[in-house]
Amino acid sequence: MEVFKDSDVLISTLGLDSHVWGKVPIYMTSGGFDPLHIGHARCILETTEMADADGGYVIVVVNGDGFLKRKKGGAFMPEEERAEIIAGLRGVDAVLIWDDGTQNV
């Protein structure tokens, strides 16, 4: 699946513009995934199972390197590698690397 750094590009690429928004279920989960552990895997699996039952999309938000630097002093793995791992998991439709300069997701 694809990795995005721009939410507008993600929305248009998946065809989730205004005429679809609100009609197709979108399931999202987020985390640092630095490194990916069993709790993350279970959370993503549960999210994909709910989306599968609903015919929805799964978007996983990966906290960017800047977010992790502010939170814990740095990242163990670069954001691109963490996002690539998540994108390779079954049921994940898209990954968004997110860092807006705050600790908000």
Regions found by a protein language model. Name each.
Residues 1-105:
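Nucleotidyltransferase catalytic core that binds NTPs
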